[in-house]
């Protein structure tokens, strides 16, 4: 599997979890938040980095809609990525059988991406993630959530 095939596989799996494709990324939204998945191709090797960005509706008196600029921006109000345990799934410089890569990507979605984004689609969920130490909130974002 090469990186292009991987992106197609990522797209198929993301869609099974109700992520919509737009502007080279994927998103899921609620009335309170917008969750974005962005695969960023490295300039230093044959690998991707997964950026998970959450934008909170109403923060700084703004409404956030999926756009190329928003999907490709480096930072959301809340940011995450793939966990250390799954970093190798995105690295094509390290050999891995296609079937194993596919299964591990599915596992990453079920164990991390889906639970994290589902929780982060609400202000209360974001507060819970911060209380558990799963995310860090800048003081300005924390104040906006109060």
For each of these PLM feature ranges, what is it?
Residues 1-9, 28-146:
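Intrinsically disordered, low-complexity regulatory regions enriched in serine/threonine/proline
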């Amino acid at each position: 599997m090469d990186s292009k095939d991987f992106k197609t596989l990522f797209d198929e799996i993301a869609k099974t979890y109700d992520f919509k494709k737009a502007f080279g990324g994927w998103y899921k939204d609620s009335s309170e938040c917008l969750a974005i998945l962005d695969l960023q191709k490295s300039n230093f090797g044959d690998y991707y980095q997964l950026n998970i960005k959450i934008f909170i509706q109403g923060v700084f008196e703004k409404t956030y809609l999926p756009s190329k600029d928003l999907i490709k921006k480096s930072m959301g109000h809340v940011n995450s990525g793939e966990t250390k345990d799954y970093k190798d799934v995105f690295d094509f410089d390290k050999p891995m059988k296609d079937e194993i890569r596919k299964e591990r990507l599915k596992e990453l979605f079920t164990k991390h991406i889906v639970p994290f984004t589902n929780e982060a689609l609400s202000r209360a969920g974001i507060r819970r993630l911060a209380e558990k130490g799963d995310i860090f909130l800048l003081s300005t974002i924390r104040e906006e959530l109060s």
